[in-house]
Amino acid sequence: MENMDDFSPENVLAPPPPPPPMKKSTDLFMQRSNSFVSKATRDSWDRMFDEAHGADVLIHTDDNGLIYAHSNVIGMASDVIRGMMKQHKRKSHRKSISILGVPHHALRVFIRFLYSSCYEKQDMEDFAIHLLVLSHVYVVPHLKRVCESEFESSLLNKENVIDVFQLALLCDAPRLGLLCHRMILNNFEEVSTSEGWQAMKESHPRLQKELLRSVAYELNSLKQRNRKQKEIQTYTQLYEAMEAFVHICRDGCREIGPTKTETPHMSCGFQACNGLEQLLKHLAGCKLRSIPGGCSRCKRMWQLLELHSRICVDSEQCKVPLCSSLKERMKTQSRKDEKRWKLLVRNVLSTKRIGGSPFFLQAIDVTL
């Protein structure tokens, strides 16, 4: 580049300008090239940058490095850089600006992207964090989107997630920040032992406290969701048991009920039938059933029978044993027990808001 002074922007025939950035293509060629423009245009703009013919801007980098560029190209790509060039007051055919704080090669990758909107895969892996910062400082939105996409697809890991999270907050990259936050929550034990976490603990203790608070909140929310799911599962099983009760006592199933099936080994459509049949047989022959607290299986059966009597629509016509007598017994129960039972009944009935059984009440009919 010794004879670079012999060239000027006016004397150089520049290749056609690149098209505006497009959405990331799923075409294999575009994926392999890591580019948003056609190969011919990319090559021409890369060649213009590499050969630096007619370059009229000197970019000073760390370690006294220099990068030659064309003001009309980088000024069109970044309003911030165009403003920096306008502030240059020296009367020479070359403008001079300084971009410090990042490795020289990372800055070359950045300037090259301003030319052709492309990058090498290895360069992105090595300098993604620097490129994210540069894209924010010099307002290059399409490069910021590329960096976010690369972090999301492959570059984000447990070792760098803390650093990337802090940069995402500083660089106004909310989606990337959300992805980092999710990774921190899902891998907190490993992330909290990383070097990035220790550095953040010293430099940004408030942010560390916020993360710890969010982790505690997420764990508590997860426990509540799990408890709620288990409750719904229990209420659903109780509702299915109530349906199976009516089926057994009205139609009969396998070896119990008013009629017996010809194929007792075959399963019916009610999953709870087998367990209920075993409980009914046990209740019929258990010698401890009349002794208070004598048999846990009998106690469970009595509770199921009472639950049925509370949700049954017509106890007079019901075939389930003791339905009407248990309904009469409700009148003598304490207020506390009655309220507890009503809450259970409503929760059980709420599991079938649509298409409930015609033999049972609706949840809306139960008042606490």
From Swiss-Prot:
Keywords attached to this entry: Cytoplasm, Metal-binding, Ubl conjugation pathway, Zinc, Zinc-finger
Top-level lineage group: Eukaryota
Residues in BTB domain copies: 55-123
Zinc-finger ranges (TAZ-type): 233-324
Example GO BP: response to auxin
Gene Ontology annotations for the cellular component aspect, listed alphabetically: cytoplasm
MF terms in GO: calmodulin binding; zinc ion binding
Name under which the protein is recorded: BTB/POZ and TAZ domain-containing protein 5
Organism of provenance: Arabidopsis thaliana (Mouse-ear cress)
Lineage start: Eukaryota, Viridiplantae, Streptophyta, Embryophyta, Tracheophyta
